[in-house]
Regions:
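Proteolytic processing junctions in secreted/extracellular precursors
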Residues: 3-5, 9-16, 126
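Terminal leader/tail segments of proteins
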Residues: 2-7, 19, 52, 117
């Protein structure tokens, strides 16, 4: 194996760390996410005067969990020990929290939301794919 192949293999092993941490913490709590990927055209990561790019986002949801509020808070608490919590909002019907892994890298920002909507309760995760 050459040096380039070892570096590429290491990049593959470390890719998806946030998503695997969220998935592992959710499984321990009893949350089963339905995983979807959506694409968004944005210039959030390139700069205000530069051309935008297509960015893939992981958009996971668990529809109709048993105790959405306690499970959502437990997931936020589990992730708070490892990631920096930027914002925590509480609403009458739920709440949300915004986390970041590295402050210098905006692609490592992700959101956990839990609420009761008109269509039923849900818990969701949204973040850049591959982070």
């Amino acid at each position: 194996m050459g040096v380039n192949q070892v570096i590429k293999l290491k990049d593959l092993l470390t890719e998806g760390k946030i998503t695997s941490d969220v998935d592992r913490a959710a499984k321990k709590i009893g949350i089963k996410f339905k995983k979807k990927v959506k694409t968004k055209f944005t210039n959030d990561f390139t700069g205000p005067n530069e051309k935008g790019e297509n960015v893939k986002y992981d958009s996971w949801m668990d529809y109709n969990p048993k105790n959405y509020e306690s499970q959502g808070r437990a997931l936020v608490d589990a992730l708070s020990s490892k990631y920096i919590r930027l914002k925590h909002n509480t609403y009458a019907s739920g709440g949300s929290a915004v986390f970041i892994n590295r402050k210098k890298d905006p692609k490592t920002k992700f959101t956990i939301s839990y609420a009761r909507s008109m269509s039923g309760p849900y818990i969701s995760y949204e973040g850049v794919k591959g982070q």
